[in-house]
């Protein structure tokens, strides 16, 4: 377990002590000088984090000066691994902890009727995560939005994998979703490119310690897409512990860890990549105006519209087949 403590004002004789706990039991410890990463050797029988068993170790990081405790931070950590591998038929699959895992979940834009992008309470943030898990999903794609840290903590604790988008910018090249892109990449201004890289790196750094984060998604449907292969590799180099979905829905390039297709409303897999995992990143868009639950009755959205819950259920079962 790799721990970095930022203590710019630590005294020369200071040291960082790390304790990893399973309940009341200490499972690993480490000591390091301020500014030097601590490496805690986890036991061979360590407990792994997954949607079925989202185990979190308690973590205590203490700044010492001689025998005196100067400061102490309590947090948590988890042990898990996101990767891809070929199955018995040679098809590249997404994996968690070296086992194939079919990731299935909603495209979550984080809208709230009264606060738009701001949830009314922390309980509301957690409620969404809990309901997502109760409905049988094991992941959420956090679409073109970055949430407060509490939302990711709830995902850590309840066992929801997160595919995290970079919020999309305007502009971009022609969108070619049903083929590999054969056009010219969009040219951002130097200022725009610098802003993108700075903000994307800050997002990755902000969420790096959340075990729920499994996939980074720098681009969506060609919005603001530029230098795709280079951005995908830069993302992977910055954080090799997560998978990189270079462009959800295209434009498609042979880079990153997966090929991500979009097709509305019914699911369809119209491309295949033998070297990467092929996923259906978006489909559905089923809409139904539920009386008594409408914020703006004249502005309901959906790729397809139904009038009764039975119609919605039938379409959902047909699409998920």
Regions found by a protein language model. Name each.
Residues 1-154, 158-162, 199, 214-215, ...:
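Secreted/periplasmic carbohydrate-active enzymes, especially glycoside hydrolases
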